[in-house]
Amino acid sequence: MDKINRRNFIEKALLYNGSIVLGGFWFAPTLENLFFQSASDYYLPIQPNNPAIARYEKKCKGCRECIAVCKDVQKVYGNYKASKTHHVCIHCGACISHCTYGAMSEKYNWQDVIQAIDDPSKIVIASISPSVPAGIGDYFGIPSGSYLSEDITGACRNLGFDYVLDTNFSADLTIMEEAHELQKRIQGKSNMPQFTSCCPAWVKYIEIFYPSLVNHLSTTRSPIGMQGAMVKTYFAQKKGIDPHNIVHVAIAPCTAKKYEITREELMTNGMRSTDIEITTDELAIMLKSRNIELSARKEPFDQFMGTASGAGKLFGTTGGVMSAAIRTAHFNITGKNPPADLLELKQIQGLEGLKTATVNIGGTALKVAVCYEMRNAQVLLDQVASGSCEYDFIEVMACKGGCIGGAGQPTSDINNLEARIKALNTVDSQAATRFCHENPEIISIYKDFIGKPGSTVSEQYLHTHFTDKSSLLEPILAQMQLEPAV
């Protein structure tokens, strides 16, 4: 059954005589029900203030699918005593993807976007992640794996966005910083292996369950984190726009990005770098709610912060970040672009949950690992914690297949995932440049604004830090300041 029917696509967006309900009618239990009763044996007790996920009580059948995937695949539920702690959530949305009754959903923020577009004092900017053009066609009867970037750009302009940018631009920026950081770590033999840090669900998982390993995370912001920072600084300066009047909207396949954009570590000059995140689902809902055809108008991205390499587009698929990083790391270390075998790096492509390879860069053998889902990541984390890990660089994504299988995407069965992977690989192979360091806009932004990877400006706007969040596992009552009895 397709996801529109399975998750009651229209019903969950337009409720009660067509009036739009922002955020849905998520489950709002009492404190007693949420933390202390055995009802959580039948469903995940999602808290009302969860920024990414909502639960619709009336639709829940108690099938336990949400618990099963959270416990067995993402290794969250069951790693703490649900009867005595917060409901711990990494916002990956696996529970949404596995709920067959539409009882779990992303928190809706698309009406906030409509409100911003309708405000004449605001400049509303959309940034499109690479998995969105590879997935949205499923909602409109277009074959899976069709890459529809120009369709989405035109549709966003019909919705009223002032600018439509390519988040792949900042994927290239991420690789410039991450490859530089990897080279420094290899040379200094410090905090190895290096973990990728562009998946916020994966980052939060480490912060909660493996806080002693947070120093292994790359300090580079995610592409969306960098995109927002550059929109509010570099883009605003070049366009002569007051950044306080900008509403930056990330359109992504990911529910965890709704959480990520709230992290204080990603603020830019006292402002949120990204003001709103909506999923592929929500973009489709917006278009349908305003009777806008997806493919009625085809236009390219705005060219300023709208140009990306093929490597940047690979961020949407498992192994893509690793492939892109290896290409630029090879150039940084040897001064030459990599040979064909490293350009493709087929050993880390595909839908196996854990893949490994050894790559030769300038006479140095670099061992890399790529995985998705926390059950696979946990194997590597335990190796790192015990000192037995043989890898130098590890990429982790929370969702099956990477971002293309995100919880905000249409149905992600094997056929759809493979079609989307093929689409992104094709876009990469046909790109004008396949190397982040050759993107002319990336060259310009370093010349005009950043300076070089690892510079003071880079550290301020393109890097972040991580914190120990293991306190979330402590009993809820120990964290509450109860008023003394009178």
Regions found by a protein language model. Give the residues of each.
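Conserved residues at beta->alpha junctions
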Residues: 13, 57, 197
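Intrinsic disorder/low-complexity detector
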Residues: 14, 26, 51-52
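Hydrophobic membrane-targeting signal helices
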Residues: 21-31
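Charged, amphipathic alpha-helical interaction segments
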Residues: 18, 22-23, 330
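Iron-sulfur cluster-binding cysteine motifs and their immediate structural context
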Residues: 29, 34-46, 52-90, 94-112
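N-terminal secretory signal peptides and thylakoid transit peptides that target proteins
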Residues: 1-20
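Iron-sulfur-associated redox domains of electron-transfer enzymes in respiratory
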Residues: 6-10, 34-37, 106-486
